[in-house]
Amino acid sequence: MFSKYIFYPIKIHHKYHTIPMMNSPFLLENQTEYKKWRDNKLAQYPASKDKILVKLNDSNLNDNSINLLRDSINKYNFGIYEFNSKLTNEYLKKFCSKLKLLQSVSNLLADENDISNITNQNTERKQSSGIEYIPYTNKQLNWHTDGYYYPIDSAVKSFLLHCEHPAKSGGENILLDHEIMYIFLRDHNPDYIKILMQNDIMEIPGNKNIKGSGSIKGPVFYIDEKNFLNMRFTSRQQNIIWQKSDMIKKIKDYIFSFIAEDNYYTFNILLRENQGYIANNVLHKRKEYVDGDKKRLLKRLRFSERVE
């Protein structure tokens, strides 16, 4: 019997504390600031992934191109790009540094550059360890934010996903800005947000397959030290402990109903060779895929900063 999931513990250096700015639109008492922010956010839709795609030249990565990508990320919390040739791992990190992404987050399957090769390793990994980690298979990957199993003071704030080789079929990535999810929850019932910001609303239990792995409790939504909204979420039903109450059941039902099908605010992205996206850790999922003679290979880099 294989364990279906593995979490990667990281050292906790300090307890997380933050005091949101008094005029934050994400504080429930700030209705005026919220309405202004909300109206501006929703005015960016509808949007087409083709219209926000930024084409880049690896030999001339100029400020104008980077600013176009940053502008998209500021609007939708992600941006899509396409390079004109294959990139090295070193160049991927250099590219991210242009967006001020410098503090990469490693894990046990990352290389010396903190880059993870997201490809179907299902057979090899089962044979070697008896553990199946869904991102490293060709299976569907359900809605989540990256690193939701990390403590907040070690959070993943952004990530890059770069396609080196696509699948023969399938493998689309579907993205949903977590700020859109926040808007719909708050507009439906502000108490939902109050509850989702509680520090013990969602718990990830320790993994018995990893020595020293302890449980992690935290909020679903939280405001960080720079006054940005972040989200910890997974649609998984196993190995997740939510607080139990009638209100929390209603909240979960609302969230799962909202993400059950693609909607006006979701982006369906099938990455081609040399394409990728950089995201401020939005909600995302992946469809099942089938490999051809050459395996689907995406490079992933995670960061503790976000694109600003």
Walk through the language-model features, giving the residues of each.
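Long, hydrophobic, well-ordered secondary-structure blocks that form the structural core
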Residues: T88-S129
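TRNA-binding/sensing appendages of the translation machinery
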Residues: R70-I80
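Active-site environment of non-heme Fe oxygenases that use a 2-His-1-carboxylate facial triad
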Residues: I19-L61, N74, S116-L271, G276-Y277, ...
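Structural motif
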Residues: E82-S85
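N-terminal mitochondrial targeting presequence
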Residues: M1-H17
